[in-house]
From Swiss-Prot:
The keyword Lipid biosynthesis does not apply. The gene is CELF3. This is CUGBP Elav-like family member 3. Its main location: nucleus. Expressed in brain.
Length: 465
């Protein structure tokens, strides 16, 4: 019989030729097995290299996890076996609590006495720094989920301990998956400071921040048509916000109206700015002799308009706004590559077209796949090992796009099972972006995996990747 609190284990990194009868001798030494099932693809029936294991006794599962997880490598495998509670063993089975807002003077014994009335405590540890000083928080593990839940219901926010700045916090400790997601969110926020979009503007960051704010205001007025531009403006503002948080922008910029000039650049004539902005080998577009006002005033969208038509002819406001951005699209192709191709002319309201025939769809998919697999110049292509199984092309693109313009991002997939092989390539258009990505992401931990990020060796190198 299975105990009520028995744990269902996930077993990974097992050879695909091993079935249940082959795996049982490995796990039976730790206790009687209630159920062992190899996971197979529901469509192809192929072995997926993992299994679910449930012992009759909870202690047997804990012993197996302690003895095998990351400790033993099965024949034919490159990585050690994974033995850990399955995802289905979710918060309902948790017994470990996080306790916050403790007083700095409270010891392990003080915390244990506080929680002992609710049940049997397996572990109680106050977290401390290298110097032994309490961090004001602790972990407490009960024998059952019910005991842990009772402690939460009674103690959370019930009192403020001496030396604490707020009421007591008692909650279930984060799972490994939740910690991994939080780390990804933190790095996504921090990576903005590496963006070449922000760094290449240098001393004119105040000008560009004002420009992007005005662009955001412009696209908000035409949100029905310009959602990709709104997205790009939001991304750019996030990059600038990340730099501001690191002290690289000294002067805050407030949103300006269509007739005012941002305070941070009021003393600098715009005529002096394009000369410095002519970077990457591009020269600024000269103003046209069509009766334009003096260049020391900003226009409502933050840039000089360059209309394609005579001023006497009626000009669509949306077309004029786009024309005013063409100068910056030319000067910064990496920054606006997601925006410029989308609006070569104002979008027209047309009836929805029927989907293309299957043959045309297949050709389009092949073209997209070929485009995704393009590589950059030597020194611009990086290889990423140890990706999480669930990561797709879009996830690694989102992870690495803050470092620069990404030409392609590809996760390699097993053709037989359609499962990720847990490695992939990302190609940039310049070596500096690739090096910044390697320095920031090599060794970055997601869940129980640490990414290995390195340069892809040139094609003529006679060495394996």
């Amino acid at each position: 019989m299975k105990e009520p609190d028995a744990i269902k284990l996930f077993v990974g990194q097992i050879p695909r030729h091993l079935e249940e009868k082959d795996l049982k001798p490995i796990f039976e030494q730790f206790g009687r097995i209630f159920e062992l099932t190899v996971i197979k693809d529901k469509y192809t029936g192929l072995h997926k290299g993992c299994a679910f294991l449930t012992y009759c006794a909870r202690d047997s599962a804990l012993k197996a996890q302690s003895a095998l997880h990351e400790q033993k490598t099965l024949p034919g495998m490159n990585r050690p076996i994974q033995v850990k509670p399955a995802d289905s063993e979710s918060r309902g089975e948790d017994r470990k609590l996080f306790v916050g807002m403790l007083g700095k003077q409270q010891t392990d014994e003080d915390v244990r006495k506080m929680f002992e009335p609710f049940g049997t405590i397996d572990e109680c540890t106050v977290l401390r720094g290298p110097d032994g000083t309490s961090k004001g928080c602790a972990f407490v593990k009960f024998q059952t989920h019910a005991e842990a839940q009772a402690a939460i219901n009674t103690l959370h926010s019930s009192r403020t301990l001496p030396g604490a700045s707020s009421s007591l916090v008692v909650k279930f400790a984060d799972t490994e998956k939740e910690r991994g997601l939080r780390r990804m969110q933190q790095v996504a926020t921090q990576l903005g400071m590496f963006s070449p979009i922000a760094l290449q503007f240098g001393a004119y960051s105040a000008y560009t921040q004002a420009l992007m704010q005005q662009q955001a205001a412009l696209v908000a007025a035409h949100s029905a048509y310009l959602s990709p531009m709104a997205t790009m403006a939001a991304v750019q503002m996030q990059h600038m916000a990340a730099i501001n948080a690191n002290g690289l922008i000294a002067t805050p910029i407030t949103p300006s109206s269509g007739t005012s000039t941002p305070p941070a650049i009021a003393a600098t004539p715009v005529s002096a700015i394009p000369a410095a902005l002519g970077v990457n080998g591009y020269s600024p577009v000269p103003t046209q002799p069509t009766g334009q006002p003096a260049p020391d005033a900003l226009y409502p969208n933050g840039v000089h308009p360059y209309p394609a038509q005579s001023p006497a002819a009626p000009v669509d406001p949306l077309q004029q706004a786009y024309a005013g951005m063409q100068h910056y699209t030319a000067a910064y192709p990496a920054a606006y590559s997601l925006v410029a191709p989308a609006f070569p002319q104002p979008p027209a309201l047309v009836a929805q077209q029927p989907p293309p025939p299957p043959q045309q769809q297949q050709q389009q998919q092949q073209q997209q796949q070929q485009q995704q697999q393009r590589e950059g110049p030597d020194g611009c292509n990086i290889f990423i090992y140890h990706l999480p199984q669930e990561f797709t092309d879009s996830e690694i693109l989102q992870m690495f796009v803050p470092f620069g313009h990404v030409i392609s991002a590809k996760v390699f997939v097993d053709r037989a099972t359609n499962q990720s092989k847990c490695f992939g390539f990302v190609s940039f258009d310049n070596p500096a972006s690739a090096q910044a990505a390697i320095q920031a992401m090599n060794g970055f931990q997601i869940g129980m995996k640490r990414l290995k990020v390195q340069l892809k060796r040139p094609k003529d190198a006679n060495r394996p990747y």
